[in-house]
Every structure is written in C-alpha cells, then in structure tokens.
Regions:
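HotDog/MaoC-like acyl-thioester-processing domains
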Residues: 1-16, 22, 89-96, 100-181
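Short amphipathic
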Residues: 23-33
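Short coil/loop residues immediately preceding or within conserved phosphate-binding loops
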Residues: 27, 78-80, 110
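Acidic, divalent-cation-chelating loop motifs in proteins
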Residues: 36-38
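Active-site helix/loop of acyl-thioester processing domains in fatty-acid/polyketide metabolism
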Residues: 47-70
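Charged, low-complexity intrinsically disordered boundary/linker segments
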Residues: 71-78
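Short structured motifs
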Residues: 79-85, 97
Length: 181
C-alpha cells in the first residue's frame, strides 16, 4: 500500500480512534512493504518523513484542525524536522508511528513522532516544528489563538532543554536558508 492507500486508510479509520486530546498520542500501525525499502532492505529515510506526515494529519483530523483551517483560510505547515535512527525497520516488520503534539510557543508547535517496533523498541524519532499559516493575512497564527478556535483550553508546558535546542537550531538553519535564497 503506497502513500495514497495509507492516507485513505488513515482517514477512513480516524473516527474509530476518537477525538485527539492535546497531550495524548496518535498511534498508527504499519508493516514495512517492498515499496518502502532501500537497497539495504529496510525502511528508507524518505518513508519515515511520509509516515510522520500521516501521524500529523491524523492528529489534525481528530482535533478538528483540518475543518477549522478550511473555514478560516488557514494552512497547517511543517517548518522543519530533525530525525535520529537507532534501529532498522526491515522488510515485512510491523511497527507503529506514535505521534504527539508536545508543546508550543508563539506561532511554533513542536511535534514528536516515534517509530516503535513490534517488540516495543524505538527504531527512530522525529521532532518537527510547524505552525498554522493564515493565507488571507499572510502571517502565522499564534497557536493559543488556534487552540481557542478549536474550543480547547489547554496551556502548553514549557519546552524541554532538548526541544529548546531543536527550536534554536531550526531558527538558525532557517536564517541560513533565507540568506542563500
């Protein structure tokens, strides 16, 4: 099942997983297929990013962000990511992508995607930063405003030292990219 098939399956089963509560996890089960592997017969690097996308979309659907974004003219966007691979996911191996919204600050949201093998070991971890872009206003929306528009009254926890380091690194790399553009 390639990207579109996995996306369709995730969307068709989202209601069975119930509403997403900030602070909880999205868990999507997969098997490493022949279309997922590289020449080492394990999940290729690009596939990790695509599967993390599915975890994010699952959260966005279940929290109501997709519907809200369409009404408001907003667009959820990823700004960057950092990944680390600690175990390989071999062909035919079962695994889960466990995704969560960790915290936010201003217009920036930190997400986490763990790739968990069927024996409970973490195979990879991806941290993401993103935001919600207001197309009509041509600006990013403060995440507290997004949370309020979703009818939630959740406050973010302070970023951990690792998350703060990631945010700072991302901002530095983003500045570098804008200089060379």
């Amino acid at each position: 099942m390639y990207v579109w098939g996995r996306l369709a399956r995730m969307m068709a089963t989202a209601s069975r997983r119930g509403p997403y509560a900030v602070g909880s996890e999205s868990r999507l089960a997969f098997r490493c297929l022949p279309t997922d592997i590289d020449f080492n017969s394990h999940l290729n690097n690009a596939r990790y990013m695509m599967l993390a996308d599915l975890g994010r979309i699952d959260i966005f659907l279940r929290v109501g962000l997709i519907a809200l974004a369409r009404r408001q003219g907003w667009a959820p966007m990823i700004g960057g990511l950092e990944s680390v691979y600690v175990r390989e996911i071999r062909l035919w191996r079962r695994f889960e992508v466990v995704s969560s919204i960790e915290t936010w600050e201003g217009t920036q949201v930190i997400g986490r995607h763990r790739f968990v093998l069927d024996n409970g070991e973490t195979a990879a971890l991806i941290m993401t930063t993103g935001g919600v872009y207001d197309r009509p206003s041509r600006r990013f929306v403060d995440i507290d405003q997004v949370v309020a528009a979703l009818g939630r009254s959740v406050r973010p926890r302070p970023p951990t030292e690792a998350e703060r380091t990631f945010m700072t690194s991302h901002q530095g790399l983003r500045s570098l990219a804008k200089q060379t553009a």
